[in-house]
């Protein structure tokens, strides 16, 4: 993308011990060299991470997923990318290591802007932690693009339970954006989505007008919420 010009590139592909996926009791832990296609082909993906299961076919094309890593996508922080959106919707956790030590950051605090995260330049992402499917919880993903596997015009990841709706929007804002609503206000979902759409700073671009994007939030966003509620 020509946004960086590093003087030194370190190849870590030979570090086989970081190509890992560990299925813990309530989380899935993913190592830094675990490829997106490996995650897509994981036999337990649908039962453990249903939101990621729904979203990962939209991630580029199969040759991209064969080479791209899960943590690479998370750390790149492209606002049109699907995996950062799921990371935020699930409020996962990323572990960063440097000479100063190890620290973890929740997804809520990780994205600062387009292609900008709170990872420092002297840190390496060593592990991603995602919470697995919970009882009485619904998950849904949806995306609108000019053609399948193209950059998203709008993407939606929703997690709902009996208490709240966690609505996450990608591509339209400059970074993945999340808002939570009390499930008691579900009957006002049209008004909530309309207010949310108008409170965003949305501009026309070569792909869609601001009016069209707001309409996507209201209509496709609502359909994604309804799908999530249906899955509870």
Can you say where each PLM-predicted feature lies in the sequence?
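C-terminal structural segment of proteins
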Residues: 1-232
């Amino acid at each position: 993308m020509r946004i960086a010009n590093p003087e030194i590139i370190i190849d870590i592909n030979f570090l086989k011990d970081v190509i890992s996926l560990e299925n813990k009791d309530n989380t899935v832990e993913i190592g830094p060299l675990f490829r997106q296609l490996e995650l897509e082909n994981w036999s337990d993906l649908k039962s453990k991470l249903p939101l990621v299961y729904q979203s990962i076919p939209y991630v580029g094309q199969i040759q991209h997923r064969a080479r791209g890593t899960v943590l690479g996508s998370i750390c790149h922080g492209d606002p049109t990318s699907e995996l950062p959106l799921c990371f935020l919707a699930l409020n996962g956790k990323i572990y960063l290591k440097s000479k100063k030590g190890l620290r973890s950051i929740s997804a809520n605090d990780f994205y600062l802007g387009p292609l900008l995260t709170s990872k420092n330049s002297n840190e390496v992402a060593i592990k991603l932690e995602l919470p697995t499917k919970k009882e009485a919880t619904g998950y849904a993903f949806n995306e609108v693009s000019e053609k399948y596997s193209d950059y998203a015009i709008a993407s939606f990841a929703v997690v709902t339970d009996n208490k709240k709706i966690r609505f996450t929007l990608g591509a339209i804002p400059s970074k993945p954006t999340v808002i939570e609503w009390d499930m008691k206000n579900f009957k006002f979902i049209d008004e909530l989505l309309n207010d949310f759409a108008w409170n965003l700073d949305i501009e026309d671009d070569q792909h869609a007008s601001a009016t069209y994007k707001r309409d996507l939030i209201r209509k496709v966003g609502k359909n994604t919420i309804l799908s999530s509620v249906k899955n509870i």
